[in-house]
Amino acid sequence: MKTHKNHLRLLILLLLVLLACVGYMTVGVHFENQKLFAYAMRIRTPKLIAMLITAFAIGSASIVFQSTINNTIVTPCLLGMDQLYSLIHTAVFFVAGSGSFLAVNANAAFAVDLAIMGAVATMIYSYLFRKTNHNVLYVLLIGTVLTSFFSSIQTTLTRVMDPNEYDTLLTDLVASFSNVNSAILVLSVAVLALVAFAFRKELVLLDVLTLGKDQAINLGVDYDRCIRRLLLGVTLYIATATAMVGPLAFLGLIIANLSRQFLRTYRHSQLITGSVLFGMIVLIGGQLLVERVFVYSVPVSVFITVGGGVYFLYLLLTQRKA
């Protein structure tokens, strides 16, 4: 009975996503003018696809991350990918300037971001995970320390950077769907699909892993290997989304917990689907608000950060009372 209710709830979320997509693609469009209509579709379609891909990457990664860590108020930003992204772009502007190839070529910047973040993720969750005897808390601590380390270096570089370069850099450090490259979208989908295929065996074991280490091992699961590979997959998903549109730190926390509270189930297939759908609603609705109400004066990441901070405090207070 509960499964049927959740299927109905997911269907409602899907309808809301479709409504948000239709609203985003049609609001403010001049249908009577074919040229303006074609121009609007050409501009909005890549943005919409980017929001759908980002919601899929962050939504699915956040649920997997929380289940792996066994904590529902943590977010994948603890892995340090957001700060590493900021450091990479700051270093490029500091060393080569805003007119350099990496600064102006979106495809090259995406490839470099993904390569560096992927290399760091592989080092942490392959080498250091073994060195810490597969201790998840140690790995999270390493991620937190690296986040502070990357942030400190980035702050130091911005303090001695040319003010004009820093002003240009700020547009890169804020998550934006305004200038999305179609080639990047194709590459992002390919990367996400390859990661999902590579870790498909671990994904189907999520329901078992949440029972705890001892129970999972008794059921024949190679627990340490599964956790290591899932954390690597989460990091690659977050790295892909961040390299594509920029850092969205609190989005994962919001949509993952909305999915858990709305569906109230331990089935990860439903939780991940719900998280992805909530992510699409938040991003598309937020971008529609940015474009039509605030006329691009405030980026969507600001609303997500403010809303995520308030929601995080709410989660802390409710869990403390419980």
Report residues per predicted region.
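Alpha-helical transmembrane segments in inner-membrane proteins
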Residues: 1-322
